[in-house]
């Protein structure tokens, strides 16, 4: 899916993009605000223009992926079987034109061509206990942090929200960086320390077996600290330097791999407020967990725009995986019926218990093997209602017959969702810009592997042409 490159936009172009985004989101807010499980209870199909209904009603899932989402199969031509209304074509074009591009400088991650479970770019010890998605992420972000550290003269990297320490471990023991690793969950910290020791032992064995292949250099394991980081107050532990002989001053680089909700905002505020922090590389996620107000909007510019508000539902939608859903549409598998079944269940729940709205239904296993009435019965039991209630079979079959409409409406919302993410990240760039700093966004991960793939890179002095080094894939 094409889009606008965040890198290289002037300050004025960034402001204008924010204006355009707020206008478009206000125009289509009814689609973004909708809950797909209320498709039948709120007659969501009827909220679409009649001309849109006519066009979308005739599309099967692969056609929705190709024609609406603009994600055809490799080598597939985009051909419309009918004339689409200009308003729908305008929506599609606008959604593509205003969203930050999520396509990195490489297409298929070459590291997984030989084995989809093992990155060929990481040695076996660094792959152990790490899923393929995380292997890709720690390698790509770790290498970017290493380059950024070299460019800005950083003496120490602080990995905030480090979890089990996979990124910290790769940066310190794989790339030779001095790393402090902050994580609020003490059990995760204890596991990270065990994995550190396990990796050190594996590297020692490898060095003994292949002394010429392994670089002999001092190994600095990550320094793990149990520490919660608040989005509103400065964390002294984050700023404390590691004791290193011969070091006269501390220059910190903050990083976070999918720093959840307010944690990404905390990194920005520490970067802005603390002179010892000279660089930032942050990949955010879980936008629905942002405090409101306080964590969005951050910039004065976006705060002053009419229609800038992003309620919970919009921020939640921005966390969906567009590329993954497009692939599911292309395969047209039975799993696509889940939204339709859940919407049918919601309609039954409202009939039985009108005050019970959108209750959480814990995952019902093997939905694709169930009949719609079986799904509804299991769902009723999960929300504390009688699963043996008499069901209107004709109504359920009528709902199931609209499965493609449910999928089409959800696809429309997904088409718009990247605009919400773009506005959130653009607001962060504008905030840093208003503080007098320099910020860029780069698509760093393959979006098929890691949907939240935009890294916010910030520095206190301009990098100029040197910034292009961060965009390249190491050979």
Curated annotation (Swiss-Prot):
Keywords: Coiled coil, Membrane, Transmembrane, Transmembrane helix. One of its GO terms (cellular component) is membrane. It is found in: Membrane. The keyword Coiled coil applies. The chain crosses the membrane at residues 406-426. It is a single-pass membrane protein. It comes from the Eukaryota. Residues 185-210 form a coiled coil. InterPro entries: Methyltranfer_dom (IPR025714), METTL25 (IPR052220), SAM-dependent_MTases_sf (IPR029063). Belongs to the METTL25 family. This is Methyltransferase-like protein 25B. The gene is Mettl25b.
């Amino acid at each position: 899916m094409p889009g606008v490159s965040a890198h290289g936009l002037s300050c004025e172009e960034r402001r204008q993009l924010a204006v355009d985004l707020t206008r478009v989101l206000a125009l289509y807010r009814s689609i973004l605000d909708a809950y797909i499980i209320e498709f039948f209870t709120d007659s969501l199909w009827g909220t679409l223009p009649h001309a849109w209904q006519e066009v979308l009603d005739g599309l099967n899932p692969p056609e929705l992926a190709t024609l609406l989402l603009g994600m055809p199969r490799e080598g597939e031509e985009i051909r419309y079987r009918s004339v689409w209304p200009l308003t729908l074509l305008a929506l599609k074009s606008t959604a593509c034109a205003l969203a930050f591009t999520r396509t990195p400088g490489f297409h298929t991650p070459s590291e997984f061509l030989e084995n989809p479970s093992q990155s060929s770019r990481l040695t076996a010890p660094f792959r152990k206990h790490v899923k393929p998605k995380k292997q890709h992420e720690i390698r790509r972000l770790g290498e970017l942090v290493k380059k950024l550290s070299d460019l800005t003269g950083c003496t120490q990297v602080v990995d905030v929200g480090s979890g089990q320490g996979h990124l910290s471990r790769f940066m310190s023991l794989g790339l030779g960086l001095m790393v402090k690793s902050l994580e609020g969950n003490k059990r995760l910290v204890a596991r990270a320390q065990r994995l550190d020791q396990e990796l050190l032992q594996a590297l020692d064995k490898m060095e003994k077996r292949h002394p010429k292949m392994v670089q002999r250099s001092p190994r600095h394991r990550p320094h793990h600290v149990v520490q919660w980081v608040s989005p509103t107050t400065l964390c002294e532990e984050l700023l404390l330097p590691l004791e290193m002989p011969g070091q006269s001053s501390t220059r910190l680089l903050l990083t976070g791999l999918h720093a959840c909700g307010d944690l990404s905002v905390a990194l920005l505020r520490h970067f802005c407020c603390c002179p010892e922090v000279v660089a930032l590389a942050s990949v955010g996620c879980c936008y629905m967990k942002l405090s409101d107000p306080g964590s969005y909007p951050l910039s004065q510019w976006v705060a002053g725009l009419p229609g800038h508000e992003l309620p919970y539902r919009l921020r939640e939608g921005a966390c969906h995986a567009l590329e993954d859903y497009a692939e599911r549409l292309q395969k047209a598998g039975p799993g696509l019926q889940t939204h339709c079944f859940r919407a049918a269940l919601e309609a039954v729940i409202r009939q039985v218990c009108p005050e019970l709205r959108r209750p959480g239904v814990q995952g019902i296993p093997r939905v694709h093997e169930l009949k719609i009435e079986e799904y509804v019965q299991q769902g009723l039991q999960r929300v504390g209602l009688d699963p043996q209630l008499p069901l209107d079979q004709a109504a359920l079959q009528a709902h199931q017959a609209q499965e493609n409409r449910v999928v089409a409406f959800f696809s429309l919302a997904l088409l718009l969702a990247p605009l919400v993410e773009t506005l959130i990240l653009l607001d962060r760039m504008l905030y840093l810009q208003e503080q007098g700093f320099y910020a860029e966004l780069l698509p760093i991960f393959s979006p098929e592997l890691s949907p939240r793939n935009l890294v916010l890179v910030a520095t206190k002095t301009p990098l100029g042409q040197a910034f292009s080094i961060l965009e390249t894939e190491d050979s």
